Regions:
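Extended, gly/pro-poor, charged amphipathic helical "stalk/hinge" elements that serve as dimerization
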Residues: 1-111, 118-119
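Proline-centered loop/turn at the N-terminus of a beta-strand
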Residues: 114-115, 140
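Domain-level recognition of nuclease-like catalytic cores that cleave nucleotide substrates
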Residues: 122-170
Length: 170
């Protein structure tokens, strides 16, 4: 009877040990490959996705990653026409709030840029339609919500920015 108890306890300890190792391995795999572990990694992957979309559709455009520079949004898009705009990309599971919009507006002021495109991959942007436009203090912003539902929205946004650029440079 005593041996059965010892064998049972020993077996449970080994199972716990194995389960602990499985959990540790799982945590390592999630950290290495999972995008849900940190918003920074998730943001990086989202920005790369949009960068690839721009690069594929607009090979003559230049996209400079700025996410590592404070108050410079995620990137700056430059077209062959000379149009430059800041790019902000959000990959939230909830509606992008107004604080994020205000931060982007501050980034536009800081960089002295008067054109911007604010993109949400999966969700709505607070107070905005799926494709929307705002102007304030001679600054023009195109908002695109749920771009992953229809990647052609990016074309609309860039065409709008190019049209605005032509109007304001006159």
């Amino acid at each position: 009877f005593k041996d059965d108890i010892i064998t049972g306890v020993d077996s449970n300890i080994r199972k716990i040990d194995v389960q602990d190792k499985v959990d540790q391995l799982n945590n390592v795999l999630v950290k290495m490959f999972g995008i849900s572990t940190t918003s920074n990694k998730k943001g990086e992957i989202s920005e790369q996705l949009v960068y690839n979309m721009i690069n594929d559709k607009y090979p003559n455009y230049s996209y400079d990653v700025k996410r590592h520079i404070a108050h410079h949004a995620d990137g700056e898009l430059t077209s062959p026409t000379g149009m430059k705009c800041l790019v902000e990309i959000k990959n939230y599971t909830h509606t992008v709030n107004k604080d994020e919009i205000n931060k982007f507006k501050d980034d536009l002021k800081t960089t002295n840029n008067n054109l911007g495109i604010f993109i949400s991959l999966q969700t709505n942007i607070s107070g905005r339609r799926l494709i929307d436009y705002e102007t304030y203090d001679d600054t023009h912003i195109i908002y695109i919500s749920k771009i992953m539902e229809d990647c052609n929205k990016l074309d609309c946004g860039i065409l709008l920015l190019e049209s605005i650029y032509k109007l304001i440079k006159k």
